[in-house]
């Protein structure tokens, strides 16, 4: 399809012929995402021409066809100049029935026919593409208060107008993700957090039985319908952006506790496929990670449903779901940074500040040790898998796994080493300045960990570096004469000296405060401390 033919018909003013040519173009390019550079100028002119047709035509079929073409063209960020202007954005906002600053648009309620609704949907899709691909369009969207104009529509989001709701939520997500000023306005002035929370309540059919406790789902209830699940995920993504600030006033905490209650309800639900369930739960976990830690007690405090007596009546169903999710992500064996670190972080902070959660998780992951014949990183238990991650190449992953286990050990270095071995924990201890032992800064309850009799009996024989009982090895020095020992010692000193002079290695020592320092400096500091303590 020649772009020049389409441009000629647009200039001629025959919208029927334009529509016919555009239908053919759309069919040919529906899956086109890479465009010919030589036709870039023609595509820019076509964008401008399409806006002209959209302003002069009032035929829904012609409008939706033009918008579909514009949506295809908007995949190319280099041709969006005409669309990213005030006039271009106003045209699209008007067709999407969004009221923007200083321009009263036609309300959405008046879009009765399927053809008119198709125009609204295509306009929203265009806006999503244009905002995503064009910084000037993002700026113009902020100036026109496009996101604020979307907020009244959130009252109408439902499965009956699925695509209108879906792309309205997606556009709100994009605007709030790409513009911090828009995010702030939505939080403080537009009441978007409450509106999005209401969307989730309606979409998930939440029925409250307590201040922050939703009625448990019926075991025989069908899974979340696919359309409702799509709306849920878009609302969760938008809420994630809007809960990134640290606002903790009384009203904000109430709203965030409601969100935590809805997330608990959502984690109990299933969708039509295991893959979609995991994706939805992943968005819920991301959102929970944004909430202040004092709101997370909502996950376990459900008086109507009740809980476990050994955990002071707290309900651990949600915590178990989070643990199962974490294990599933570990077992996948890839994409740990994006897929695993959010749930690790959530479980870590929950365990750090909620004693019952920590006790429950520790019972699952770090039960009392019995068999210490194998290294901590060898095996298929959750502990083995997490210890392996402590030496992962990705810094965020290794730190997340190490911090999680450290918190489960109440930030006690001795307890951590018991479960992981010094070698696996060295990175965390060095970063925390705890190589000499001690505890972290968080205050924990005084209940003590008890060792099993099996562990106590072999404790003196455990290699503290590897964390397990090693088979006795023959001492190579036993077969050497004194002259051979002296020769090997001198050779070792020479090799270390050569590597040090070439700065390939740097001998390190531990200061009294547990931090690392070059060996000479560490010895000097210790000498000064010793001489100071000996003086009167």
From Swiss-Prot:
Q: Which Pfam families match?
A: Ric8
Q: Which UniProt keywords apply?
A: Chaperone, Cytoplasm, Guanine-nucleotide releasing factor
Q: Name one GO molecular function term.
A: G-protein alpha-subunit binding
Tell me where it resides: Cytoplasm, Cell cortex
Q: Which GO biological process categories is it annotated with?
A: G protein-coupled receptor signaling pathway; pigment cell development; sensory perception of smell
Look up the domain of life of the source. Eukaryota
Q: What GO cellular-component annotations does this UniProt entry give?
A: cell cortex; cytoplasm; plasma membrane
Q: Indicate where this protein is primarily found.
A: cytoplasm
PANTHER family named among the record's database cross-references:
SYNEMBRYN, SYNEMBRYN-B
Q: Which family does it belong to?
A: Belongs to the synembryn family.
How does the annotation summarize its subunit structure?
Answer: Interacts with GDP-bound G(s) G-alpha proteins GNAL and GNAS. Does not interact with G-alpha proteins when they are in complex with subunits beta and gamma.
Q: What does this protein do?
A: Chaperone that specifically binds and folds nascent G(s) G-alpha proteins (GNAS and GNAL) prior to G protein heterotrimer formation, promoting their association with the plasma membrane. Also acts as a guanine nucleotide exchange factor (GEF) for G(s) proteins by stimulating exchange of bound GDP for free GTP. Acts as an important component for odorant signal transduction by mediating GNAL (G(olf)-alpha) folding, thereby promoting-dependent cAMP accumulation in olfactory sensory neurons.
Its protein name is Chaperone Ric-8B
Lineage, top ranks: Eukaryota, Metazoa, Chordata, Craniata, Vertebrata
